Amino acid sequence: MTLPHSPGSAGEPQASQTVQVHRLEHRQEEEQKEERQHSLQMGSSVQRRTYRSSEEEQQFSSEDYALAAALALTASSELSWEAKLRRQTTTVELEERGQRRVGFGNDLERMELAFLRTQRLLRQRRDWKALRQRTEEKVREAKELIELCSGRGPWFWIPLRSHAVWEHTTVLLTCTVQGSPPFQVTWYKNDIRIDPRLFPAGKYRITNNYGLLTLEIMRCTVEDSATYTVLVKNAYGQASSFAKVLIRNYLGKDAGFDSEIFKRSMFGPSAEFTSVLKPIFAQEKEPFSLTCLFSDDVLEAEQRIQWYRDGRLLRSSTRRQILYADRQASVKVSCAYKEDEGFYTIRVSSPFGPQEQSAYVFIRDAAAEKPGAPGSPLNVRCLNVHRDCLTLTWVPPSDTRGSTITGYSIEMCQGDSEEWMPCLKAPGGTCRCPIQGLVEGQSYQFRVRAISKAGTSLPSKASEAVVTGDYDAVHKSTEIPYDLGSKITISKNDFEDAVTIPSAPTNVHASEIREAYAVLSWEEPRPRGRAPLTYTLEKSVIGSGTWEAISTETPIKSPRFALLDLEKGKSYVFRVRALNQYGMSDPSEPSEPVALKGKPATLPPPAQVQAFRNTQTSVSLAWEPVDGGSELLGYYIYSREAGASEWQTVNNKPIQDTKFTVPGLRTGKEYDFCIRSVSEAGVGESSAATQPVRVKQALATPSAPYDFALLNCGKNEMVIGWKPPKRRGGGKILGYFMDQHDSVESDWHPVNRQPIPSRVCKVTNLHEGHFYEFRARAVNWAGIGELSAPSSLFECKEWTMPEPGPPYDVRVSEVQATSVMLQWEPPLYIGAGPVTGYHVSFQEKGSEEWKPVTPDATSDTHLRVSDLQPGKQYMFRVQAMNSAGLGQPSVPTDPVLLEDKPDAQEIEVGVDDEGQIYLAFEAPEAPDFPEFQWSKDYQGPPDPQRVEVEDEISKSKVILKEPDLQDLGIYSVVVPDADEDTSASHTLTEEELNKLKKLSHEIRNPVIKLISGWNVEILEQGEVRLWLEVEKLSPAAELHLIFNEKEIFSSPNRKINFDREKGLVEVIIQQLSEDDKGSYTAQLQDGKAKNQITLALVDDEFDKLLRKADAKRRDWKRKQGPYFQEPLTWKVTDDCQVLLSCKVTNTKKESRFQWFFQKKEAPHGQYNPPTGDGSLSIEGFSKENQGVYRAVVSDERGEDDTVLDLTGEALDAVLTELGRIGALSATPLKIQGTEEGIRLFSKVKYYNVDYMKTAWFHKDKRLESGDRVRAGTTLDEIWLHILDPKDSDKGKYTLEITAGKEVRQLSADLSGQAFDDALAEHQRLKALAVIEKNRAKVVRGLPDVATIMEDKTLCLTCVISGDPSPEISWLKNDQPISFFDRYHMEVKGTEVTVTIDKVTSEDSGRYGIFVKNKYGSETGQVTISVFKHGEEPKELKKK
């Protein structure tokens, strides 16, 4: 290949090189400029001993060097020739470097160009000496200018500016003045000179720092509002500047440059978080979301709000949405996977720096398809992707659900098919597996399932899609840029020689050896030719001396192959051959011996696992890292409550750090933790469990006290009070250290050397008329807390006003949605008279108005404030009142948010195991060893003579010693050292106290709990069992059974059993008799517990029991032989038959079964000996079948019978049931045309007139039988006949069948086509009836056969009918008869007679009379047999 090359472009830098050259030039110029400035500055500040050379004419001072530095910066444009020179030199170097890198061009041409450039550089030299002389001249001119300008009056370079600030803040007035010689400075306030010595110490601070004048006014008050002027003057003149300072009352915002208004005006609004991210516990395959609220709208939210997971920036995807709307930012995941677990951080950029919040998201394992199956693997990744193979890795699951993982199954999805097919099972059970046999250029995804004896896990999240290909092709090509943006790509294959047979591959080696496989790698042959290559492998066992080809399903296209069929314990060597379309290469050199490794060992557990308290619901863990190198994938953490045996997984994604905070724990509970290392070999052994740690807030020093107030004041003493720290640090406040400061002094002095346990301190040895301020620090077990801000200045002046001083220590407790409880201490200064009451007022946050809680004053030092609005914040204050009026108000409380806390603790009232009535309160969120302050009726602690208080770790109990009406009232409790309100109250009423006393009596005088009182049962053989059940008793329990005031014991007829384990007492009487009548009392005693249960068996109850026992005994005796297991019963079948059935048991072959009806045997009854079933079926049951039915079974062991009386009510029941089933069997109404009209009918299987009633309706109007409508029934049919139907008969017809309570209705619509069809059928049948009536017919008379003796006269007579009269003809053997001689016919009306005189044998034959008219014809036939004299007729012979 040839490259485009021309003389004009030879050696010229390309576009990308040009950009680099310009950047390098610019950076070099900046560096040179900085070096010059630095050298000049160093010269101005450090005096060095220098020596003048022969060329130097003058030595410069430090001022000269400073001026020269400024002139050098302005003269940089004149030295541009130097930059040009360096730029050209750099260009030459880059060109030469580029030419060496590309490796093209003419060496002679490069040398000529370099020579010409060097000549040009030499010609551009300048005279350095002339340049130095010109610089010195400019320095002298500048010095003269300075001398001319040095003497002048002062003037303000930056004047004063006005300030408007909040009170108690500091104001700093500054200005900059220039002038020479130095000037005098004087400050004025409203034209009055300010002398700091005349004001309190530290009030004013005045400084003059080289022309920068400052006046600092400390802790401004409203009196500091004024016009401040600064006057400066020297010998040449004077100047002044003034500024106004406005002091505003503090409204809760910062002042000056820290104010919110200033920030927004300068930088725009800065949104703050108004909610806190909390840990999320989501489940695999389910959605979850993280939401954060802001105080203001976030401008350009897409750019300013960023979400991170484990430090990686998150972006929206198909499963993940990052949203912002309505001051709410959220990240929503539609389908969670374990890979989504981790630390989520929201970061919002602002002008004051980024704001962040973080929370951990836990992804729990989804429910397995089979119980006990392990959790799914995670982090499935594809590594070493080649043309036909890759390596798959994953992370083992943390939760195996008690069953060891034995292996992993891999599934594969090819392309966009979305069909997951089993790929293979990972060999060895490690978390790494080679995948082979892939198609080049195809996209693949993989997922993994864990396998254990309990089953297979759910699939992991699918890996990222990868496309197979030759990823080494990038390293085989070189890109050469030219012109502007163009480039040429040269592939190494382009330089391959035109060889046919490739050479042998080289460097055959095992790149990876595992327990179950080894990966063989090699380098392509050189030369290889341009034809595509494939490879074949051969193996040889060390010592065998033979080579065996390794068969593969597909050709090997990549220089890498995984060997999965190697045997453990053997060493192999391998060699490779290359193939192309021309042939096969020689084998490569054998590899080094390869043998499979043993099973990889898991990493050891981390050491020194320590658990520390963190918050009320979390614990911090820390441990030493495991030296696992790249094999370490992270750590799994497990937890359990102290005393539990089963460990619970904390995280499902390995943690990379060596510390972690476990959230979501139960406050006050103790937990153990252990950690396991994770690697590709699996999850390692558990570390040693930590010491049990209680979930509590970690100990820390408390925050600062605040809101100092003056409670009383004398001539030289003050009483100061304050509020406790908002954060107690998780421990009890042990006391306070207090400092005081006299405003005329500069130093602070401690008030006390030992901690003050209370929040009221009396400070003595003060100076009357002086102003003092105070500050304090709280102390707990962790140490001394933060120092508070100084209080306001309090004047030490004795109080003499008649009104009382302020109440103090106003406390808010029992906060609910609409009410709070206020308590306070009375004022220390009562004024002119005693305190007569207190005035309580409240203020809603954001309002400036104080409203009274009640119209009248309260005399108590507590008050429940009700009827407040939920969800709002309120502040409260109290004023004492005496005869002189209202006194000073107390310090307002902090804003209190009114809401019902779902997990708020309440006072528990009950009775303990010893029968003591108690009131208990548990505060799991309280600090260690909390103090519980109980009070009764808010008047102070309960009377110790009546109650006893017991405190535990986080629980306190008040025990009533002798409960009485004096103990009624309101019991309240407060935990003062808790950061949040931890309080409750309970009103103990008389009704509740009586219940508790009753329960206490039961506990102190225990009664054996009765589960079931006396029960009476009759056993199978007629024995009577008396039993009762109580709670489980100890082995020492005793039983005394009293019968009619006399203790009884077991006897042959009366057996007594006492099972203490089951609490069962039973008495079994073998044969009950009159001697057993009376009362039975069981007296039980188990330690102190007693009980007595009595059963009375007397009067009718005993007689009834006696009869039942005798009957049971007789029944048992009856069952010793064959007996009826099921008595005789009747049943109506669907065919309306009455079926009598019974069943016998305990029969044998000789047993006899009989049926009887009315004391007569019924032979048609049936009996099936194998099953014992007897049955008697009665068809067409009616009142004739009423009577007594009896079945008897007997053999030599005895006899038993069963009787069924089907008379009276029983008979009515059977017939009613027959009617009901008959009604249900009625078929739908059918319409039929008849000769007389139209007939509607329904078929039934049974009909009984007495027990089934029918009614017909036409158009919902009841029909009655008449001339045209007739209704009737038969045994199997119910019908309605409409005679001579007309159009008015059209409509809906309904048949109502009533059988007892069963009513059934059947309907048919006789209209339209149905009516027309029925009417046509009626007319057809009617016409056929007319024809049939008038047709010629032979009605009667002719016999079938007539026998006559010869010579007798035969007379045949028959009756005919027909209208009109029919024609008559006689036939003999189907031939007409001629009536003459011996044949005569006579017709008399409808009677026709044929006479044959003197019959002969020839007259024998078949005769017939044929009648005919217009409606039809008919033939009557008779056979005539003539026998001779003396012969017997044939008919008689046959007989």
Curated annotation (Swiss-Prot):
UniProt GO cellular component terms: M band
Gene3D superfamilies per the UniProt record, alphabetical: Immunoglobulins
Organism superkingdom: Eukaryota
Subcellular location field: Cytoplasm, Myofibril, Sarcomere, M line
Bias (Basic and acidic residues) ranges: 22-38
Alphabetic keyword roster: Coiled coil, Cytoplasm, Immunoglobulin domain, Repeat
Main subcellular localisation: cytoplasm
InterPro entries the UniProt entry points to: FN3_dom, FN3_sf, Ig-like_dom, Ig-like_dom_sf, Ig-like_fold, Ig_I-set, Ig_sub, Ig_sub2
Domain Fibronectin type-III, chain residue ranges per copy: 376-471, 504-599, 605-698, 704-799, 806-901
GO function term, MF aspect, one: protein homodimerization activity
Residue stretches in coiled coil: 119-149
Domain spans labelled Ig-like C2-type: 154-246, 269-362, 1122-1207, 1336-1425
Region described as Disordered: spans on this chain: 1-57
A Pfam family this chain is assigned to: I-set
Tissue specificity of this protein: Mainly expressed in slow muscle, extraocular muscle and embryonic/neonatal skeletal muscle (at protein level). Expression in skeletal muscle is fiber type specific, with the highest levels in type IIA fibers (intermediate speed) and lower levels in type I fibers.
Segments of skewed composition (Polar residues): 39-48
Record bears the keyword GTP-binding: no
Subunit structure: Homodimer.
Reported function: May link the intermediate filament cytoskeleton to the M-disk of the myofibrils in striated muscle.
Protein name in the entry: Myomesin-3
Source species of the chain: Mus musculus (Mouse)
Recorded name of the encoding gene: Myom3
